UniProtKB/Swiss-Prot annotation:
Keywords: Calvin cycle, Carbon dioxide fixation, Plasmid. Heterohexadecamer of 8 large and 8 small subunits. The keyword Phosphoprotein does not apply. This is Ribulose bisphosphate carboxylase small subunit. One of its GO terms (molecular function) is ribulose-bisphosphate carboxylase activity. Coiled coil: none annotated. The basic functional RuBisCO is composed of a large chain homodimer in a 'head-to-tail' conformation. In form I RuBisCO this homodimer is arranged in a barrel-like tetramer with the small subunits forming a tetrameric 'cap' on each end of the 'barrel'. Pfam families: RuBisCO_small (PF00101). RuBisCO catalyzes two reactions: the carboxylation of D-ribulose 1,5-bisphosphate, the primary event in carbon dioxide fixation, as well as the oxidative fragmentation of the pentose substrate. Both reactions occur simultaneously and in competition at the same active site. Although the small subunit is not catalytic it is essential for maximal activity. It comes from Sinorhizobium medicae (strain WSM419).
Amino acid sequence: MRITQGCFSFLPDLTDEQITAQVEYCLGRGWAIGVEYTDDPHPRNTYWEMWGNPMFDLRDAKGVMMEVEDCRKAHPQDYIRLNAFDSSRGLETVTMSFIVNRPENEPSLRMTRTESDGRSQHYTWETQR
């Protein structure tokens, strides 16, 4: 099952040239870039592992792509995403986020429904490999 999180998630995987173009777009607007990775793509898992610190002072897309490549080498079977942060309002707000690496075999999600008091329905999601 293809995980659909962030911008461009319903499109085919971006090439490195397309990723570079998106990074240049972000840097051109003064947004900082951060690289994150995870092996658990559950929709409620919003806290991915950071790959280094966000690159607040970087103005060159090549530096971001070097970090992406290093993260890909260290975590080839994990999800890797780029986050762009906009601080123009005095807050570091995620303005853009998209996946740049996926494992060869993506896990699927299984939903379990249980009935409780008053016929209330409760749902549980599990990641299956």
